[in-house]
Curated annotation (Swiss-Prot):
A Pfam family of this chain: DUF436
Name the record gives this protein: UPF0340 protein SaurJH9_2150
Originating organism: Staphylococcus aureus (strain JH9)
Lineage: Bacteria, Bacillati, Bacillota, Bacilli, Bacillales
InterPro entries (UniProt xref): Antibiotic_NAT-like (IPR028345), DUF436 (IPR006340)
HAMAP family per record: UPF0340
Domain of life, per lineage: Bacteria
Coiled-coil boundaries: none
Family: Belongs to the UPF0340 family.
Signal peptide: none
Length: 174
């Protein structure tokens, strides 16, 4: 997928991925192949995307988390090594192509020691196909603009975050 490679290269060039961070991926493989979200899914597309992200992880030190679909309440598949019981709650579900989505399913099958958590708060994310990842992005969510607007036929939305600016009229900010 040339557009996926171009997108990931552009994000690497702008230092979007940071060592030790978790980046959330939401993806509708149905949308990537030009179909309505949640209708057909593709494990082949999921494999391609997962493998491309794995390369980025090895190059940059970022870890990826994978959002499931609404049928599992957009639960997140992560490596157990990333699990923090103080801020995350593990749930009993295994993503499936028809209840979780192809990419979350593929990730669960190919991660070293996967678990699924109900909610996560991460500093950045990539949404391929309008899967609504915003609920898991740290406040304050900031859009990231790239020259790549689609992966396959799916619209891509990218977000990072910044600290909240709090205070009143006397407050000063960096």
């Amino acid at each position: 997928m040339k557009d996926l490679t171009m997108l990931l290269d552009e994000l690497k060039d702008m230092s979007f991925f940071n060592k030790g961070d978790i980046c959330l991926i939401g993806c509708s493989t149905s949308e990537v192949i030009g179909e309505k979200i949640g209708t057909v899914g593709s494990m082949e597309v999921a494999e391609t995307i997962f493998n491309a992200l794995d390369v980025v992880s090895k190059e940059t030190g970022v870890t990826f988390a994978f959002q499931g679909c609404e049928h599992i309440n957009r639960a997140i598949t992560i490596e157990k090594s990333q699990y923090n019981p103080l801020t995350m709650e593990e749930v009993s579900v295994v993503p499936d192509v028809h209840a979780g989505g192809s990419l979350a399913t593929y990730a669960f099958q190919h991660m070293k020691d996967p678990i699924v958590v109900e909610h996560i708060t991460v500093p950045c994310g990539i949404d391929i196909g309008q899967t609504l990842i915003g609920m898991h992005i740290k406040h304050v969510c900031v859009p990231v603009r790239t020259s790549v607007k689609q992966v396959g036929q799916a619209i891509v939305t990218i977000a990072t975050s910044r600290p909240k600016k709090i205070g009143g009229e006397r407050a000063k900010y960096k």
